[in-house]
Amino acid sequence: IQDRLFTIGSSLAADPEKSKMKIPDLNTEDITLLEKEIDIMVSALPPLKSFVLPGGTLLNSHCHVARCVCRRAERLATGLSESEWVEPMVLIYLNRLSDYLFMLARHACFVRNITETPWRPRV
């Protein structure tokens, strides 16, 4: 994941028209790997019946913070794509990575027998 984030940074920082360097790229295998890992975690977890509040443990909280940062990066990259060329795989990868981080947070609670806190909206 860290290597792919550096790849994304290279892609977003470089001007493909002016760059003389070969820019690393993402490929479908990178996304497929995330999706496979998500599927493995989903198969072990109970289904969600409501939204869950972030938190529970330090690890779980870190996963949720990382997910929020990833979502923000996705929104910024999407906004950038409206005025500049952005490799489509970058947007797909960031979207799947945030899903992966959400499942990782849930999985971290599950393997430690920590009950997730459901969101109970005031209505």
Tell me the role of every PLM-derived stretch.
Residues I1-V123:
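Phosphate/pyrophosphate-binding loop motifs in nucleotide- or prenyl diphosphate-using proteins
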